[in-house]
Amino acid sequence: MNPFDLKSVLLARHAQHVVLIHFPIALFLVSVACDFLAQWKRAAVFDTVAYFNLSVAAFASVPAVATGLMAWRWQLEGQRLKGTLLLHLLLGLASTALIWLVWWLHFRARKPERALPLYRLPLETLAAAVVALTAHLGGFLSGVNAPV
């Protein structure tokens, strides 16, 4: 396969998911780090950075999930899910739900009379762990984490 052939790159059965998934992962993890920094340093700028990173991560997770589902339907022709692929799918959906839940907490706190709840930090830690585990399994599915 020629790496410069746009048709083969864009129409590969799973390529879009592999490309798109890195954006919400990175943005979410950076937003969690900024939120912890905002809490620790009491700096409002980190709150703002966390919110905007989280917003983009949440919205970017939608096409990432959609392309993941399409990759399963196209590449595996919709066959029954099992093993690592099933776990990756379930954790991916859980990750997306957690990212949106954390975003919603931040979105609600943008109103002047609301403050961010303290339980968001353990929730963000849990979400980051679920995202990391999902990504780890995705690495095995893509062959990146394959045994040498």
Language-model regions, residue ranges each:
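Polytopic transmembrane helical bundles with strong interfacial aromatic enrichment
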Residues: M1-V148
